[in-house]
Amino acid sequence: MSAIDCIITAAGLSSRMGQWKMMLPWEQGTILDTSIKNALQFCSRIILVTGYRGNELHERYANQSNITIIHNPDYAQGLLTSVKAAVPAVQTEHCFLTHGDMPTLTIDIFRKIWSLRNDGAILPLHNGIPGHPILVSKPCLMQAIQRPNVTNMRQALLMGDHYSVEIENAEIILDIDTPDDFITAKERYTEI
């Protein structure tokens, strides 16, 4: 395990799913449980950003010493507000950024992206499609959240020092946004 923070955003409404996806069953827990567990195989601490149903997540994870919970009251204004809420809690020179609905990221993916670290941002792609986790230096992260007139984190990072890297693991682009996505992902990545 490396001394590195990982921001995991879990604040959204899951509106396309039709139900709250963070607590959908996955392996022996939930999608979010598995996303956190997988990140902690490589990272030393999770900065979990909550919003919608934040009290439930606080109750579930508050007693875990390697999870810092940040509530984003502005979560309805978009993902960028969640990252901005988390940044003051970052204590390491680099940090990963990912989402709570990415339960298939493995330690090997984190390790591979970590090995490419530099003073900017490492933006992983799979077949040209942007994915996660993103790795970013703390100075680069601070600059990104202060950029005016940006609507998302990737856009803010693209305006600074960044390196796009092709990764062969399709898991970095796995999106669980709809019921069909969930069924397909469970069939492909879990033992039912």
Curated annotation (Swiss-Prot):
Keywords: Magnesium, Manganese, Metal-binding, Molybdenum cofactor biosynthesis, Nucleotide-binding, Transferase. One of its GO terms (biological process) is Mo(VI)-molybdopterin cytosine dinucleotide biosynthetic process. Transfers a CMP moiety from CTP to Mo-molybdopterin (Mo-MPT) cofactor (Moco or molybdenum cofactor) to form Mo-molybdopterin cytosine dinucleotide (Mo-MCD) cofactor. Is specific for CTP; other nucleotides such as ATP and GTP cannot be utilized. Is also able to convert MPT to MCD in the absence of molybdate, however, with only one catalytic turnover. This is Molybdenum cofactor cytidylyltransferase. Monomer. Interacts with the Moco-binding chaperone PaoD. It comes from the Bacteria. Coiled coil: none annotated. The N-terminal domain determines nucleotide recognition and specific binding, while the C-terminal domain determines the specific binding to the target protein. When the N-terminal domain of MobA is fused to the C-terminal domain of MocA, comparable kinetic constants as wild-type MobA are obtained with GTP, and the activity with CTP is completely lost. Consistent results are obtained when the N-terminal domain of MocA is fused to the C-terminal domain of MobA: the kinetic constants with CTP are comparable with the ones found for wild-type MocA, although no activity with GTP is detected. NCBIfam families: matur_MocA_YgfJ. Mg(2+) binds at D101. The lineage of its organism: Bacteria, Pseudomonadati, Pseudomonadota, Gammaproteobacteria, Enterobacterales. The keyword Metal-binding applies. Its EC number is 2.7.7.76. Disruption phenotype: A disruption in the mocA gene impairs MCD biosynthesis in E.coli, resulting in an inactive PaoABC aldehyde oxidoreductase devoid of MCD cofactor. Disulfide bonds: none annotated. One of its GO terms (molecular function) is nucleotide binding. Its cofactor is Mg(2+); Mn(2+). It catalyses: Mo-molybdopterin + CTP + H(+) = Mo-molybdopterin cytosine dinucleotide + diphosphate. InterPro entries: Mo_hydrolase_YgfJ (IPR017696), MobA-like_NTP_Trfase (IPR025877), Nucleotide-diphossugar_trans (IPR029044). Mg(2+) is essential for activity. However, Mn(2+) is able to functionally replace Mg(2+) with a 50% reduced efficiency, whereas no MCD is produced with other divalent cations like Co(2+) or Ni(2+). It holds the Pfam family NTP_transf_3. The keyword Cell division does not apply. PANTHER family: MOLYBDENUM COFACTOR CYTIDYLYLTRANSFERASE (PTHR43777:SF1). It comes from Escherichia coli (strain K12).
